[in-house]
A protein has these predicted regions:
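Extended, positively charged loop/linker patches that create polyanion-binding surfaces
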Residues: 89-91, 95-132
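Mixed-charge, glycine-accented linear interaction segment located at domain edges/termini
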Residues: 137-201
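Solvent-exposed edge beta-strands and adjacent loop segments
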Residues: 2-88, 143-161
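Short, flexible beta-strand-to-coil junctions
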Residues: 79-81, 128-135, 171
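Short, mixed charged/polar active-site loops
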Residues: 31, 135-138
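Hydrophobic beta-strand residues in large extracellular and virion-surface proteins
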Residues: 22-24, 125-127, 182
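Beta-strand secondary-structure signal
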Residues: 73-77, 124-128, 163-167
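Noncatalytic linker/hinge segments flanking ATPase motor cores
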Residues: 64-66, 82-86, 115-122, 164-172, ...
């Protein structure tokens, strides 16, 4: 018997295409677009499953597994070496001045955010991935912080790439909260404004 290979219109329309657009603190007054980027953006969600051992067990058993840990991350390479991008790559770094006059120094050893500096964690990192039907998958990770190493290379006939590996974090006040959210939106993120209330005026 021949296997049916035809695709439905919905299957075609929901194919994700092209690179993603990434925003820091999307929908907040501090919203900004990341980049320019190279190589697109990659979201990953990982759960650590544990099988409950019991007498008579012969293999994996439905209802006898727990989730011990959840992780969510977004990876993206930025070509921008602005102070804002470097601060994102160096959580907890010490900054004096602003803009082109900013001076950035290493973070002090110790507990991050122990002094109440909220800038260590971004409110959110949001990626928009375009679908064939013109809509977008909007993927948001919460309380994002880069945990990758910063490398800056000056190479002839090449551009430096800042590799960001941003992980979502729970908060101490909500240890079972949301790490990420995936939804479908029709709005073109290129038309996004810093304060969403401005769109209503």
């Amino acid at each position: 018997m021949a296997t049916t290979k035809n695709l439905t219109q919905q299957q075609v329309e929901k194919i994700q295409i092209d690179e993603g657009l990434v925003y820091v603190d999307y929908g907040e007054s501090s919203q900004r677009k990341l980049g320019p980027t190279r190589g697109g953006a990659e979201f990953s969600a990982t759960a650590t499953y544990r099988d409950i051992e019991f007498d008579g067990r012969v293999g994996k058993t439905a209802g006898m597994q727990t989730i011990d840990e959840n992780q969510a991350a977004l990876k993206v390479n930025s070509l921008c070496c602005s102070a804002d991008e470097l601060k994102l790559a160096l959580p907890g770094c010490r900054v004096s001045g602003s803009g082109d006059n900013a001076v950035i120094k290493n973070a002090k050893a110790g507990v991050l955010n122990a002094d109440g500096v909220s800038s260590v964690y971004c409110k959110n990192i949001t990626m928009f991935a375009k679908l064939m039907d013109g809509k977008f998958k909007k993927i948001t990770i919460y309380n994002g912080m880069n945990e990758g190493a910063l490398t800056i290379k000056a190479v002839q006939k090449a551009e430096n790439e800042i590799a960001l590996e941003i992980y979502a974090h729970y908060t101490t006040s909500d240890l079972n909260g949301d790490l990420y959210q995936i939804e479908e939106v029709a709005t073109d993120p290129q038309n996004a404004v810093a304060n969403p209330q401005q769109e209503e005026e």
